[in-house]
């Protein structure tokens, strides 16, 4: 997206309000060739009603056929080119827990995991240990690990996830992940991807060596993996690009982090999906763009729990009337990527998308699902970068281009 093209077209006196409701990992697959996806299986009368008044399609955020990570996928939804604006998961996780990243910091996202006697990963999430156990393990590592010449920060994120930060001179984030992102494999050795990152890579290798020795008798979290090494980027801000006063409502730190890195106001984490809508209602008069994030669709997909994912979609559907009661000008319902429970992982499949607005040209499709979206006017593989200009146009916030 050409930000310089958009900026002069923004209407200064525009009032239209936009809600971007993201069900993480929404896209799915049928378990059998003649079956339905999770979204198609779910009973969603409220979303189906909106679909009959909306424009539908399937989007992708990164080059077609490539599986996106969560951070890059969300950047696409926010109108940033995910390939140009690449960011490590560590920065997003650090910002998501309100860690104040400095100019000499490099962050990574950590997972406590379970390995066998040969160092082969048997559970990438260590049984989804509770956050309190993650805090204990972080404290244990901080207390015993010694890395001369740098400051080490370890903070729990949520459940098995933690944030790793090194602070010091001459650190560079171009270090390869130790996380193979699969069971049945050993952790990778951290390698510098550029010569200037060799110091950082050596520190990571030493951290891993000491940390594994400390955790070897713990159970189930007897090891850890790291990914997404990066420092804080300097990017154009979301509100400046789109002429909006945005706010993010998200429970999980990583998604709060991606909102922070683009300059959104981020509200305190809610305890449930219903409380997220409570926040939407509370702050409705203070903002004009609302990013509302639902995590559990992705979590159940990664766990291979088809019925659990269906249930969460149905819970979200039950909240739709509360959103519509606020009288938004535009409501976009979509996901950041697909996480089919059949695959237990992110996938390359396109993501169902609905743009409901007071100015929509309805497609006349009376359901919201992957195959219904195939018939929609937005197309079967439109670019996620197009969502923000479409949202602003539907909200009557953009002037015409050209004479």
Residue ranges and their predicted role:
Residues 1-403:
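Feature captures the catalytic ectodomains and active-site-proximal regions of enzymes
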């Amino acid at each position: 997206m050409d930000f310089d093209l958009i900026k002069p077209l923004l209407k200064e006196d525009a009032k239209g309000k936009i809600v971007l409701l993201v069900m993480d990992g929404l896209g799915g697959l049928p378990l059998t060739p003649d079956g339905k996806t999770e979204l198609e299986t779910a009973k969603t009368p409220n979303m189906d009603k909106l679909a009959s008044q909306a424009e539908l399609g399937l989007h992708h955020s990164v080059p077609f056929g490539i599986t996106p990570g969560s951070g890059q996928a969300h950047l696409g939804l926010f109108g940033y080119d995910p390939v140009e604006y690449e960011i490590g998961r560590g920065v997003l996780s650090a910002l998501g827990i309100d860690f104040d990243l400095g100019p000499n910091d490099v962050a990574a996202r950590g997972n406590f995991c379970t390995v066998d006697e040969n160092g082969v990963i048997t559970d990438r999430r260590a049984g989804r240990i509770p956050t309190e156990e993650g805090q204990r393990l972080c404290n244990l590592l901080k207390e015993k690990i010694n890395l001369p010449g740098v400051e080490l920060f370890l903070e729990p994120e949520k459940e098995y996830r933690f944030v790793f930060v090194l602070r010091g001179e001459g650190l560079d984030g171009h270090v390869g992940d130790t996380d193979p992102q699969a069971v049945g494999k050993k952790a990778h050795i951290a390698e510098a991807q550029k010569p200037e990152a060799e110091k950082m890579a050596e520190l990571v290798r030493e951290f891993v060596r000491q940390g594994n020795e400390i955790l070897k008798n713990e159970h189930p979290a007897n090891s850890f993996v790291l990914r997404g090494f990066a420092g804080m980027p300097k990017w154009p801000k979301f509100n400046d690009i789109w002429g909006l006063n945005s706010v993010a409502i998200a429970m999980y730190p990583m998604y709060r982090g991606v909102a922070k890195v683009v300059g959104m106001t981020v509200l305190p984490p809610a305890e449930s999906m219903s409380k997220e809508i409570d926040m939407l209602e509370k702050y409705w008069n203070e903002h004009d763009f609302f990013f509302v994030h639902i995590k559990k669709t992705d979590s159940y997909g990664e766990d291979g729990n088809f019925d659990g994912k269906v249930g969460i979609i149905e819970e979200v559907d039950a909240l739709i009337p509360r959103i519509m009661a606020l009288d938004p000008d535009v409501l976009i319902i979509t996901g950041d990527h697909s996480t089919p429970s059949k695959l237990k992982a992110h996938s390359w499949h396109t993501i169902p998308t609905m743009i409901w607005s007071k100015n929509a040209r309805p497609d006349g499709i009376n359901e919201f699902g992957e195959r219904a979206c195939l018939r929609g006017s937005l197309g079967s593989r439109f670019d996620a970068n197009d969502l923000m200009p479409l949202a602003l146009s539907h909200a009557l916030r953009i002037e015409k281009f050209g004479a």
